[in-house]
Amino acid sequence: MNRKRVLFLVLITLLAVSVAFAGGQKEQSLGSEDNPIIWSFVPSGEMERVAAGAEEVADMLQAETGYYFDTNVATEYVGVVEALSSDPPKAHMASLATFAYIMAADRGVAEAELVAVRYGSPTYNGQFITQKDSGISEVSDFEGKTFARADPLSTSSWIIPMIEMKAAGVDPDTDLANVVDAGSHDTVVSAVYNGDADVGATYVDARTRLEEDYPDVMDEVVVIGVTTDIPNDGVQFHPSISEEMRGEIVDALMKIASTEEGKEALNTAYQWNGLEQHGDEFYDPFRQVLQASGMDVQELME
């Protein structure tokens, strides 16, 4: 009788421990309040504005999916790539610019699901800007000038401009007087407007973001060239995110992007007007541009 009783108590204890363990595991599952889905953004615009828009979208996502999200804006594009590359990952979702996404995808740490729509298109262009009286009218004039870029991994602000400078006979490594890392496209425009840089490159048309602070920016800072088409940024997932969870988030984001409130939040963060579903193959034509230029994607991380 005593032995049976002891066995019964042992079984009850084991059951209680396993239930408690399972409950603890459930509480710590990804997307729970204690273990939120981390969504990392790059600082393509003014960081406070990007952060505010990202947080609004995350709140809407939580309401739609029941998952908890933790958003952050990295100080550099490479910071998001490194967060995805960590083991365990320090980012489960990302909104990477084109080149940074290709770099992360080549490492096997990011998979595209959504591409942003701006002005009705899932692609965009970069632009070269300078002061209206600078005397600079084409890329070949950049030699000996100070160039402002948003980030070393920014597609429209540095990667494509590098390719176009080389094509025009200007070596970006040796022929420029200086390269200024402005930190965002907004501050590239500011640098050119204030004379801290002779020329810069941004997405089209980053100048509009500064019209409130500089009412004459559209007149004083002029566009002297527009780059080839570039796939827009979007939403990417770490491969460890399950298809089920990924599908729920994608569906919710598509729903959010169709509402006025959602559009406003997406526009605040990144000037996104909508979202389209595209996988990694959407970026293949741009990969071909990089390959044709002889650019080593991973070398730029070193």
Residue ranges and their predicted role:
Residues 98, 204-205, 227, 239:
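Short secondary-structure boundary segments
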Residues 68-76, 174-184, 222-225:
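Short beta-strand-to-loop elements that line the ligand-binding cleft
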Residues 1-34, 130, 302:
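Short, low-complexity disordered leader/linker segments with a strong preference
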Residues 79-141:
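Acidic, polar ligand-binding/catalytic clefts
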Residues 32-41, 45-59, 230, 236-237, ...:
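An extracytoplasmic/periplasmic, membrane-proximal ligand-sensing/linker region
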Residues 104-116, 210-224:
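Ligand-binding "clamshell"
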Residues 34-64, 99, 122-190, 194, ...:
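Bilobed "Venus flytrap"/periplasmic-binding protein-like clamshell domains
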Residues 64-68, 88, 95-98, 105, ...:
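Sec/Tat-exported extracytoplasmic proteins
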